[in-house]
UniProtKB/Swiss-Prot annotation:
Chain residues that bind Zn(2+) 1: H63, H65, H143, D213
Keyword ATP-binding: no
Family: Belongs to the RNase Z family.
Catalytic activity, as annotated: Endonucleolytic cleavage of RNA, removing extra 3' nucleotides from tRNA precursor, generating 3' termini of tRNAs. A 3'-hydroxy group is left at the tRNA terminus and a 5'-phosphoryl group is left at the trailer molecule
Name used for this protein in its record: Ribonuclease Z
Disulfide partners: none
PANTHER family: ZINC PHOSPHODIESTERASE ELAC PROTEIN 1
Amino acid sequence: MEKFEVHILGCGSALPTTRHFATSQVVNIREKLFMIDCGEGAQMQLRKSKLKFTRLNHIFISHLHGDHCFGLMGLISTFGMLGRTATLYIHCHAELERLLTPQLDFFCKGMSYKVVFQTFDPGKAEIIYDDRSLTIETIPLRHRIPTCGFLFSEKQIPAHIRRDMIDFYEIPVYELNRIKNGADYTLPDGKIVPNNKLTIPSALPRRYAYCSDTIYLPHIIEQIYGVDLLFHEATFAQSEQARAKETFHTTASQAGEIARTAKVKQLLIGHFSARYEDESILLQEASDIFPNTLLARETLKISIESIKP
């Protein structure tokens, strides 16, 4: 089974604490690493995770609050000291490129690799990354400044050929690609062999949605409907609902409601306010509405399993 893992580097919010690093994650899909947000200390957590720096080529920044991007310059500089040669792509709002370019020119001149900014409009849902096995799409969110989440979607792979049936019907090799892609096969006598006799369905494609930071926003449900794993911020308990609304954040109960209505398979909550020394109240409030809820914590790794159709 191909890897599809989410590694939690940090799960705190804006105020640094001794318990949590700022929210940051790495998604490992088939040994390609994708970082989501890069708060202060993210590179130290990346080292602890034992993930290979050389496989991290894409970083996605949800918005321009410091707890989501203050770690970028340090990480970029470290890559340079390690002699990196592969291009690093930073997917972000255009403002971040304008902010970081002078710093790169000052601190990172003459590095052995290129940093390329690929900008997007956070208010628009669009595919911003596409390869042969994966797409990454923005999820417009509502925060105090322009913000988006990210939807990671595997592409459906072709069905698996049944070698025994191919041999039985003496089907030539040049027909196999058509059959893998869903075609039936016509025998020399005109009889049609249906595709489902010649193939075994491949596993269903997996999806992961990352939604932080945002006010309670039901209109994201259509875009994230049915995902295998949803990370949703749960900055506050329900007793702080007014504060959550004022600061454009979400309560744990509201995160649970989003997960339940969107019929996701599993909910992971994070971006915890520093006021909570024990986040069990947040887990309880989310679980009361959506039982299959996990509490994010540093070093947590979640594997999204393949599901047979």
